[in-house]
């Protein structure tokens, strides 16, 4: 089967997040070492990453949350995505998970690359009525890492109290060099207000090209189509109760 063109926008992207007991951390680390190739080979998977997460309080090297793990998967079809829970990878995480959640996403905008690819294609944009998820991901240049980490605390502190923020946490493929953030917002206006009007975040945006922090970067925005499972795994705030989503105990 030929690979879709780089500009092809997937119909469905899913974010799976698992909360595990601390006693299961060694088993989670083993899965992170062995499961990525199996995840990429699942039928219907166009692009996939297994990710560690952070608490979202600082987005720095000391922010790791070893009791929460995630997978971001780009699918060819919704039917293929529906088979994930019964796949060897899905069952493997379910065996050690205390709780879990799946977020169904539609790409709205995306720029940049991840591992040399454009996994979300070239979305045309458009209006979104309802919650949006913002994903930022970068591979830091080692010589610039210290400067980057010093710039993060003011942004993290500002994000914590941002109006309309429903959930936020860090994600990463490795402890230091491959960093990202996930944030969920009540609507696009709240995201735009924080991203472009908050002084700390604007300062970081301005410094990015001049500091040369990133060897590779990607910024994407998604419509949140559904939240299935225990949204507290995402750190969802009480305001999230206003969002329509399927909840399963």
Predicted regions and their residues:
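Short S/T/G/P-rich N-terminal loop/turn motif that feeds into the first structured element of a domain
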Residues: 1-68, 78-84, 96-180, 190-197, ...
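Extracellular/lumenal glycan-associated surfaces
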Residues: 74-77, 186
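A common structural junction motif
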Residues: 89-97, 201-203
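Active-site/pore-lining binding-face segments in mid-to-C-terminal subdomains
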Residues: 186-205, 209
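An exposed tryptophan-centered "aromatic clamp" motif
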Residues: 213-214
